[in-house]
Every structure is written in structure tokens, then in C-alpha cells.
């Protein structure tokens, strides 16, 4: 079998790729692996899910796997991914399990594991779990009987604990702010409106009626058209959109203009520096963040550290360097002082808190970043490595970088999952960016044509 765990856990088509049998096997392997690491007590697991219909099926399989291996389970029901991480820490659990495919379409689902404290599961533990599943050794372990079988407890007030935690982190009350929140018919449907109201905001919730089938369906952080319209119609100061598991946050201004993760990071970085909480005056972002963010942060005296694409790499850099803020252009924002993973509702609260504290509209705050025009071309290739590394391609990239200088940049990277090479160019004008990107893309096509 191929690699089971990707950068965001196990993902696949529910009941096709990600079957109940696989969910059970992963859960059994996780429970046994943790028990072997610490035999002083039976493992304790927190299990949550988003609103996908398949979540109920997978939850049953995972809970059965955990308890059959002797682990006790706290079942928290439908909650955001960061809430499951938070409750894993609160319960002093050995592992957290979130059943979600985040922003993916409804037919997909996933299994994301958290370690004690709600942190990312260490790679070595993940590899042991994967090896056990792949070798099919999960059926060979001795099964506990009698009192050794794990028990299940349903936590009914987990959402309340989480909301109180979030609201307690906010520097300024949100009284007087009217916000439209798009809950993506997902895990934020109850929690996000509750948190924003508890903090003082007037809330209009849309796409907050999940039925198991409508999660991320033309709504949420990847589809903001309805949010833009609702903000204008309701005369709100801003709109906030989350994805299916509420680990992302993007916003729109009172006029309906989108504010992406780069701009949100810049707003929060300036607020935190002003409060003296931006460690080393440093922000962590990925290489996909717009050059406009780097230019803005340099102008403001804030250092920008770049990582590979993926919020896991942002998290790793934040923890390794003891930094206080990082994220992605897509809206994954991480504030380690308050959360162990990207938290969309937390981000929304702090974004509105900055508006309340300064009295400035979102559009004015977001203007600190002037994104450069960006062109992205996905080039189909026969071989991703050849397409990205051929001498003629590298020469064209070098020529482009010399032309653009400090006024633009080129990012060339093979896709991790598809036979594509992604060519991204930022420049002073869209015309220049497109011309440069097309030149490079043509060299990529020539170097590795599709057979």
C-alpha cells in the first residue's frame, strides 16, 4: 500500500478508500502503540468529528477499535478540529482523533491524530501506527477482556468549554461589531456564532444548517460569493468564512472584498507587536504567501520566516523557534499561546478584536498588505522531477528572476499528488506576471511532455 498518513493524517473517499475496517485498524494500532509507550495506565482518547454523514460510521469504527484495544474514549461529537486538540489537552488524554477531511468535498473523510497536549503526533509514533496497519498486525495483538475493555464517555459540554477558552483570549470586547459568519455547514455551525456572540458581536450566521450532505457545498472559506453578498445585504462591518472543520478563517470587508490569510496574518502581527506578544518580532509563513506580505512586514520592521507549503511546517517552525504567530495564505493561522493547531474561530475573534481596539474598518487594516499580481499555471507533465529541474527550465527561471529583481518572484514546484509542475509568478503588473509565467511554463512542457 502507499503512504497511509499524509501531511494532514489519513484522507480518502469515505467507505471506498477510507473504510470502517481501515478506521478500526488505525484505532487499534494507535491504542496499542500508545500502551506500549506507557504501560502505567490504559490510554485515554478524545474522539470528535465534523458534520459529514460518513463521520457517524467512521466514529463507530474508531471508537470500537480504541476500546477493543483497552483504551477509554471521551466522545465529543461534532466540533472543530482545533476544539478536539484543545479538549485532548484539557482531558489530559494520550491521543486525540478528529474525523474530518477539512475543506474537501462531502464524500471524502479523514482521520487526524493528535498527541498528548493536543500537539501533532510525533513522526515516529505515526510511523509505528502505519507500519502496524500495513503489516496487518492489529489482529494479532492480545485483546483485553472483562474489565480490560475500554469504556466510552460522552462529553456533552465540550463546545461550551471550548467557547469559553476562545473568548477568554480576546483583548477587546466586540460590542458594536456586526459580522456575517459562513459556517460551511460544518463543524463551526454552532461554535462560531456562539463564540462571536459571547465576545459581544452581533452575528448573522449563514450556511449553519448541516444535514450531513451539504458541508463545503458552494460555501465556506473556498466559496465566499454568498458571504460577500450577505455582508452587503445585512450592512455588516465584515464577514468571516470557515471551512468544514473550522481550522481556517478568511474574511471579507464591509464592501465585500476578500481579505486572505496573508492580510489577516499581517493585521494580527501588528496587533501582537503592539501588545508585546510577537516573539522576536517574527512572523512565520509559507513560500506561497504573496511577496506583498514580505514587503509589508519588512516596512513595519517585522521579520518573515518562510517554510515549505503546509500548516504542519508552519507549526514545526513555530515550536522549534518558540515563535508566536504563523500561518498560510489559505487562512490557516496558528497562535501557539492559545492553540496547538490552526484555529479559524480563534483567528476570527482576534481579527475583530483588532477592529474593536483600533476603531478602524477591516479594509483599512488589511491595506497594510498590497498583494502583488500573481499568476499560477499548473503544467501537466510526464515526469514532475524532470519538468521542474531540467536545465532549460532552471535557466528560464534564472532569467525571469534577474528581470523581476526585488519587484517580483518566481516559485516553481512539482505537485506532491498530481503529474503537474506549478509555476507561480508575482510581478508589478498582471501582464508581466503572465508573460513570465507562460515563458517558464513552455519550457516545462518542452522538458517533460505528457506522453
From Swiss-Prot:
Residues that, per the record, bind Mg(2+): 102, 243, 245, 247
UniProt EC number: 5.4.2.10
Modified residues (Phosphoserine): 102
Gene Ontology CC: cytosol
Enzyme class: isomerase
PANTHER family: PHOSPHOGLUCOMUTASE (ALPHA-D-GLUCOSE-1,6-BISPHOSPHATE-DEPENDENT) (PTHR42946:SF1), PHOSPHOHEXOSE MUTASE (PTHR42946)
The name this protein goes by in its record: Phosphoglucosamine mutase
Originating species: Salinispora tropica (strain ATCC BAA-916 / DSM 44818 / JCM 13857 / NBRC 105044 / CNB-440)
Amino acid at each position: 500500500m502507499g503512504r497511509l498518513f499524509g501531511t494532514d493524517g489519513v484522507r480518502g473517499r469515505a467507505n471506498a478508500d477510507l473504510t470502517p475496517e481501515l478506521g478500526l485498524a488505525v484505532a487499534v494500532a494507535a491504542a496499542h502503540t500508545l500502551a506500549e509507550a506507557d504501560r502505567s495506565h490504559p490510554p485515554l482518547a478524545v474522539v470528535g468529528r465534523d458534520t459529514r454523514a460518513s463521520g457517524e460510521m467512521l466514529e463507530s469504527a474508531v471508537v470500537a477499535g480504541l476500546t477493543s484495544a483497552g483504551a477509554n474514549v471521551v466522545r465529543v461529537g461534532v466540533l472543530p478540529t482545533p476544539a478536539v486538540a484543545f479538549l485532548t489537552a484539557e482531558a489530559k488524554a494520550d491521543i486525540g482523533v478528529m474525523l474530518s477531511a477539512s475543506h474537501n468535498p462531502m464524500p471524502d473523510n479523514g482521520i487526524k491524530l493528535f498527541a498528548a497536549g493536543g500537539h501533532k503526533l510525533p513522526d515516529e509514533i505515526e510511523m509505528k501506527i502505519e507500519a502496524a496497519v500495513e503489516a496487518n498486525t492489529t489482529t494479532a495483538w492480545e485483546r483485553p477482556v472483562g474489565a480490560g475493555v475500554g469504556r466510552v464517555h460522552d462529553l456533552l459540554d465540550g463546545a461550551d468549554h471550548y467557547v469559553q477558552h476562545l473568548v477568554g483570549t480576546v483583548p477587546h470586547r466586540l460590542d458594536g461589531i456586526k459580522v456575517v459568519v459562513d459556517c460551511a455547514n460544518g463543524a463551526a455551525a454552532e461554535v462560531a456564532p456562539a463564540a462571536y456572540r459571547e465576545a459581544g458581536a452581533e452575528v448573522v450566521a449563514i450556511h449553519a444548517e448541516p444535514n450531513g450532505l451539504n458541508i463545503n457545498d458552494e460555501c465556506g472559506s473556498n466559496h465566499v460569493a454568498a458571504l460577500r453578498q450577505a455582508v452587503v445585504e445585512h450592512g455588516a462591518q465584515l464577514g468571516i468564512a470557515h471551512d468544514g472543520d473550522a481550522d481556517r478563517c478568511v474574511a471579507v470587508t464591509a464592501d465585500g472584498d476578500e481579505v486572505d490569510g496573508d492580510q489577516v496574518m499581517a493585521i494580527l502581527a501588528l496587533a501582537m507587536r503592539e501588545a508585546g506578544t510577537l516573539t522576536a518580532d517574527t512572523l512565520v509563513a509559507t513560500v506561497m504567501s504573496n511577496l506583498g506580505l514580505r514587503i509589508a512586514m519588512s516596512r513595519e520592521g517585522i521579520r518573515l520566516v518562510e517554510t515549505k507549503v503546509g500548516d504542519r511546517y508552519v507549526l514545526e517552525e513555530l515550536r522549534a523557534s518558540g515563535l508566536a504567530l504563523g500561518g498560510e495564505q489559505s487562512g490557516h493561522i496558528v497562535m501557539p499561546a492559545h492553540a496547538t493547531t490552526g484555529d479559524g474561530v480563534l483567528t476570527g475573534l482576534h481579527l475583530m478584536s483588532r477592529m474593536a481596539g483600533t476603531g478602524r474598518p477591516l479594509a483599512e487594516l488589511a491595506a497594510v498588505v498590497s498583494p502583488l499580481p500573481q499568476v499560477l499555471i499548473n503544467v501537466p507533465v510526464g515526469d514532475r522531477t524532470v519538468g521542474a529541474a531540467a536545465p532549460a527550465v532552471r535557466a528560464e527561471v534564472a532569467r525571469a528572476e534577474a528581470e523581476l529583481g526585488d519587484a517580483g518572484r518566481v516559485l516553481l514546484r512539482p505537485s506532491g499528488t498530481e503529474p503537474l509542475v506549478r509555476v507561480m509568478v508575482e510581478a508589478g503588473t498582471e501582464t508581466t506576471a503572465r508573460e513570465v509565467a507562460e515563458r517558464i511554463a513552455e519550457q516545462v512542457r518542452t522538458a517533460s511532455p505528457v506522453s
